[in-house]
């Protein structure tokens, strides 16, 4: 059964690994296994909601612009305006809102179709280790193919769709959501800072969708309110700090440091899974 200290640790792990490209789903399998505790999907959902609050807190101005752009687009559509010919290029808020929508579509489809099967088949620590190595390879590759300067005004809907597909692959435990989206963005020619910003904002619909699907499981949580609150607050604080850290690092630091980390943890995880 969860206690407050374990909840704080897991909240910190979620907050850090959700935004740094090291796989939150993988770490939420590994850390409870090391601590000898069972959390379940319901507690994971509480932690994901905490990181969602962190995103809203850090990117609140961008989110307001996204909402504004979406509402204006809907108004245009009801008035018969062909937004895809003219308006999306003229109004940045509208264009960015639709870039997020287009990127969310494949993620949602993949999540609905694959999530249950993957969580059943690939939840073990051996698979986490294998997919952490995949994450490491993707990060390492992207650093050597990231010379683009594409920003919001230049990003195509095709590129948004590809990044959304890569985000959908994060249903595999050990595949980093932020890692796959930032890396795919870099390989597509996105500016480093914009690739990270788009990645974080693209995660909002995915986290909300996953939370709505799993909200029914929260009633099954065998933990006190204080334990849940501790995990939630911890994920918010560490999530916010991790976003701030990565947004600074992405400008001048290489993603190789995360690739090396995922490689080391992945190899150790595979060895322990086979030996123990």
Swiss-Prot record:
Membrane topology: Multi-pass membrane protein
First-listed, main subcellular location of the protein, grouped into a coarse class: membrane
Pfam (any one): BacA
The enzyme's E.C. designation: 3.6.1.27
Compartment(s): Cell membrane
Catalysed reaction, written as an equation: di-trans,octa-cis-undecaprenyl diphosphate + H2O = di-trans,octa-cis-undecaprenyl phosphate + phosphate + H(+)
UniProt GO molecular function: undecaprenyl-diphosphatase activity
First-level EC class: hydrolase
Keyword terms: Cell membrane, Hydrolase, Membrane, Transmembrane, Transmembrane helix
TM region(s), chain numbering: 40-60, 98-118, 121-141, 155-175, 200-220, 227-247, 255-275
Coiled-coil features, chain-numbered ranges: none
A GO CC annotation given for this chain: plasma membrane
Family statement: Belongs to the UppP family.
Function: Catalyzes the dephosphorylation of undecaprenyl diphosphate (UPP).
Record protein name field: Undecaprenyl-diphosphatase
Lineage of the organism: Archaea, Methanobacteriati, Methanobacteriota, Methanomada group, Methanobacteria
């Amino acid at each position: 059964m969860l206690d407050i200290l374990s909840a704080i640790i897991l909240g910190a792990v979620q907050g850090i690994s959700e935004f740094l490209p090291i796989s939150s789903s993988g770490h939420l399998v590994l850390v409870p296994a090391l601590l000898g505790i069972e959390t379940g999907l319901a507690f994971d959902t509480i932690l994901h909601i905490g990181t969602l609050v962190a995103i809203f807190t850090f990117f609140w101005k961008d989110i307001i612009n996204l909402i504004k752009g979406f509402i204006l687009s809907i108004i245009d559509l009801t008035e018969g305006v062909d937004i895809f010919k003219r308006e999306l290029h003229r109004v940045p808020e509208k264009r960015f809102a639709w870039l997020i929508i287009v990127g969310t579509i494949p993620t949602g489809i993949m999540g609905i179709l694959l999530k249950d099967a993957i969580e059943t088949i690939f939840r073990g620590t051996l698979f986490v280790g294998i997919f952490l190595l995949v994450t490491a390879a993707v990060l390492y590759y992207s650093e050597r193919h990231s010379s683009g300067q594409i920003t919001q005004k230049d990003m195509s809907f095709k590129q948004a769709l590809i990044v959304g597909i890569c985000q959908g692959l994060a249903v595999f435990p050990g595949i980093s959501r932020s890692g796959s989206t930032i890396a795919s963005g870099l390989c597509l020619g996105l500016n480093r800072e914009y690739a990270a910003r788009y990645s974080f904002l693209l995660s909002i619909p995915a986290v909300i969708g996953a939370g709505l699907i799993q909200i029914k499981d929260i009633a099954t949580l065998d933990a006190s309110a204080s334990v849940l609150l501790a995990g939630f607050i911890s994920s918010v604080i560490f999530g916010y700090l991790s976003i701030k850290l990565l947004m600074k690092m992405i400008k001048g630091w290489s993603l190789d440091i995360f690739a090396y980390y995922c490689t080391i943890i992945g190899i150790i995880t595979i060895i322990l899974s086979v030996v123990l």
